[in-house]
UniProtKB/Swiss-Prot annotation:
Its EC number is 4.1.1.50. This is S-adenosylmethionine decarboxylase proenzyme. The gene is speH. Keywords: Autocatalytic cleavage, Decarboxylase, Lyase, Polyamine biosynthesis, Pyruvate, S-adenosyl-L-methionine, Schiff base, Spermidine biosynthesis, Zymogen. Heterotetramer of two alpha and two beta chains arranged as a dimer of alpha/beta heterodimers.
């Protein structure tokens, strides 16, 4: 039986208000709010302010991580939400970010991580990484 160990949401938000995503000061409460709304366990976080504008940040979670990067000149926010355990936590954090950032267009990829767990012969399987 296939069971994943986590959900990884990779998303690009387009058409986001550039004033909202220009600074870490504006992004911090939105990202931290997503962590709370998703019922995630924050271990630590770090944010970086680009000059003249733009922000990046990562929140280390007991469940994995949430990270973002902004390009205010394009109205673009790229997001990475990876959580282990209950997949609803990643979905809830993503829903919160969508509601707060109000993108006009969104592209997403949702990946089940560790989906070979439980597969017959997994222990004997050899994986080649290039």
């Amino acid at each position: 039986m296939k069971v994943g160990v986590g959900i990884h949401i990779i998303a690009d938000f387009y058409g986001v208000d550039s004033k909202l995503i220009s600074t870490t000061e504006r992004m911090y409460p939105i990202i931290e709010g997503a962590v709370k709304y998703g019922r995630l366990t924050k271990i630590s976080s770090d944010y970086y302010q680009f000059r003249p504008q733009g922000a990046s940040g990562v929140v280390l979670l007991a469940e994995s991580h949430l990270s973002f990067h902004t390009w205010p000149e394009y109205g673009l926010v790229t997001l990475d939400i990876y959580t282990c355990g209950d997949p609803k936590t990643a979905d809830d954090a993503f829903e919160y970010l969508t509601r707060e950032l109000k993108p006009t267009s969104v592209t997403t990829r949702k990946i089940v991580r560790g989906d070979l767990v439980g597969e017959e012969g997994l222990n004997e399987m050899q994986v080649e990484i290039h």
